[in-house]
Amino acid sequence: MNRANWFTVSPEGAKALGGLHHFVTTGTALPPKLIHLVFLRVSQLNGCAHCIDIHTRDLLKAGMSVDTVVLVPVWHEAAYLFTDQERAALAWAEEVTRVGETHASDEAYAAAAAVFDEKDLVDLTLTIAAMNAINRMGVSFRLKPRAKPDV
């Protein structure tokens, strides 16, 4: 079934969501590689193929190795590949993305706050929230990945 092209049906809505995306990617002190890492993990949790494709490519362009990128879904078992800041961001991204289950626990907040100052933690949470919103639009309207078949 074909679904609406939400960019053309609601250009104002797309622009508003794009504005939040622009802020979190250019208006914070968070390193670009960290932002794309969070974008990728959130997209994996939400099952957004379009966003997984984009942010995998962005991480590779930002200098993260293929070996590390392929282990993002199991980062807990490959924690040694990630910095303290990356591990804290990944853990907080999972906590916030699964907020219905986790309720953004005090323990998880304290762990993130031990690594990020207050402003960066707020900006990180905005980054997570932005990608969750974008993923929900991508999945709901079936945005396709850019990847081409190997055959």
Annotate each predicted stretch with a short phrase.
Residues 1-151:
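Hydrophobic alpha-helical segments
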